[in-house]
């Protein structure tokens, strides 16, 4: 399980460089860029966030920044207007929020099911339940467009890799900082198939 206080909570790179890397990491996460700011560290060369796969603060914070950046500026405009002007959400924003939550849930559950007993190096099979849940959430969010990873992707099961490709293809929202065909485009395709 997650310890409450440990030495890894202290800056890995020292205070000044650590704050700089944290700032860049935050921007990279919000922009769904996935740049490896760690480089060659004690965790290995170009390891993304695999060294933090047992640190819920890093994974949840990075994951939520990815989600926020992936919603798109139209949705954020509606959220701001909802709280400041009490205006209603547009249809686009309603679809984006609902499908983002749905894709995160589907991705998280799929990752848990497909990787639960995978004990390959860097996978979640040997993790505790809280670590598995946080890692599955993070991978579900990150694989859609950001490119960060907290597990060794080469050791995932083939089913997880296929699911990753589907999530990557869908991507994030229109007007967002992420990629993919966009969630709303996927929604239009699905609705048009089932409407006939």
Per-segment meaning from a language model:
Residues 1-196:
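Membrane-proximal intracellular helices of multi-pass ion channels
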């Amino acid at each position: 399980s997650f310890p409450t206080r440990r030495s890894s909570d202290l800056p890995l790179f020292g205070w000044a460089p650590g704050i700089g890397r944290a700032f860049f990491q935050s921007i990279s996460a919000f922009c769904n860029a996935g740049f490896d700011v760690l480089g060659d560290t004690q965790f290995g060369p170009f390891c993304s966030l695999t060294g933090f796969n047992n640190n819920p603060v890093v994974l949840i914070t990075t994951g939520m920044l990815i989600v926020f950046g992936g919603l798109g500026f139209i949705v954020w405009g509606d959220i701001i207007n909802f709280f400041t002007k009490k205006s209603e959400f547009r249809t686009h924003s309603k679809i984006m929020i609902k499908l983002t939550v749905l894709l995160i849930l589907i991705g998280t559950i799929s990752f848990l099911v497909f990787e639960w007993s995978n004990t390959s190096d860097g996978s979640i099979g040997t993790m505790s339940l809280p670590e598995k849940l946080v890692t599955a959430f993070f991978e579900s969010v990150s694989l859609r467009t950001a490119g960060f990873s907290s597990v060794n992707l080469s050791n995932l099961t083939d089913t997880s890799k296929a699911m990753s490709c589907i999530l990557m293809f869908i991507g994030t929202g229109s007007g967002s900082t992420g990629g993919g065909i966009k969630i709303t485009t996927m929604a239009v395709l699905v609705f048009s198939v089932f409407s006939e």
